[in-house]
């Protein structure tokens, strides 16, 4: 049902019981700081530019419990390619016992990552492209963008709230020009006259 009703139709959906069996307490800032605070993480601005590499603990200290909105966020992926970087594989290995493959997501017959009908893959056990954890203080954001590989993103909100804007792929030309996407907070009507 999930594939036919939502994925194939490019129809966004919020699944409210997708994490009911997960130990979400293990994904709170206090737990992550206590268990992984010494880990080095990549810190980005809203245009996806790497700003700094620092410890997770330092990021929390600088961006949580502040009155001013956070300007930067952590994007911490599992290893995508063979380069020396600050990957989150150890984090996901440690956290794997606290979450599971969402019940509504297929285990087989996948395009990205490829998985034949007779085989299965689990998000918790297998490599998935761009599997990562994103952490941000209140007010941090990413700009409007198109996910790589024409992928269908699966976001699991563990803590706090998130405002998200989704646009149908048919609207891509209205919000993108010369490789640049419209800034939703400051729409340039001259550059993006069709965007609404």
Q: Which role fits each region the language model picked out?
A:
Residues 1-196:
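N-terminal accessory scaffold of Fe(II)-dependent oxygenases
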């Amino acid at each position: 049902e999930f594939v036919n009703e939502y994925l194939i139709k490019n129809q966004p959906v919020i699944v409210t019981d997708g994490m009911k069996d997960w130990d979400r307490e293990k994904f709170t800032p206090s737990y992550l700081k206590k268990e992984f605070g010494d880990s080095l993480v990549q810190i980005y601005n809203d245009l996806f530019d790497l700003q700094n590499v620092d410890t997770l603990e330092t990021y929390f200290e600088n961006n949580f419990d502040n009155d001013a909105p956070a300007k930067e966020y952590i994007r911490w992926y599992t290893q995508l390619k063979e380069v020396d970087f600050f990957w989150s594989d150890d984090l996901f290995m440690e956290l794997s016992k606290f979450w599971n493959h969402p019940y509504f997501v297929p285990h087989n017959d996948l395009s990205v990552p490829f998985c034949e009908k007779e085989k299965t893959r689990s998000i918790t056990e297998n490599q998935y492209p761009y599997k990562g954890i994103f952490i941000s203080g209140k007010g941090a954001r990413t700009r409007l963008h198109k996910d790589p590989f024409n992928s269908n993103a699966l976001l699991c909100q563990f803590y706090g709230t998130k405002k998200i804007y989704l646009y149908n792929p048919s609207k891509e030309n209205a919000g993108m020009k010369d490789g640049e996407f419209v800034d939703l907070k400051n729409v340039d009507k001259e550059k993006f006259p069709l965007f609404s």
